Amino acid sequence: MEGSLMTEAQSKIRISVRNLVEFVLRSGDLDNRRSQGGKKEAMQAGSRLHRKIQKRMGADYRSEVALKHQVREDEFSILLEGRADGIITETSGIVIDEIKCIYMDVERLEEPDPVHLAQALCYGYMYASEQDLDSVGIQLTYCNIETEQIRRFRQAKTREELEEWFQGLIHEYVKWARYLYHHSI
């Protein structure tokens, strides 16, 4: 860009899907950790349960699918990276599964946590774009760490809906990136 002081290296941002959605959307926290002291144990228990759920899902379930997506807005080139917990191939189409292990009673959940849903929507957009799909299913799988009780929330999204939502998310993130870049010393 003529007149821009920004170099190509300075304009590149690499961020995980989780960090992006947490930064833009975080306003509260679903009670998935009882205390800071038990955080390591809770994370280990959650990881074990996560793998157990994935193994139960069968042959049509691909676990830990790495995804990358490059997007450019204004002077920024953003590389978004992450791993979809699962991609399910069904006769009706593809479903992106995001698994969250929590201490909360899953029956008390009325809807997915907005940050968790945003993470799944990002993966849905990234996968639909990469595979040139018209639509995908978005599934949030919540599992109680102590009881192993599962509750799922599912919705269908067109690629157009996902793209519109994703562009809004990136636009909000770029507002911050632009401010930080232009106001840093």
Positions of the model-derived regions?
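A helicase ATPase "motif cassette" and its flanking acidic/Ser/Thr-rich regulatory loops
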Residues: R14-V17, Q167, H182-S184
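Mg2+/Mn2+-dependent nuclease catalytic core
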Residues: V71-F166
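Hydrophobic residues within well-ordered, non-membrane alpha-helices that form the packing/core
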Residues: I53-M57, Y127, I170
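Extended, charge-rich, solvent-exposed interface segments
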Residues: F166-Y173
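Secondary-structure transition/capping residues
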Residues: D60, E64, D134-S135, A177
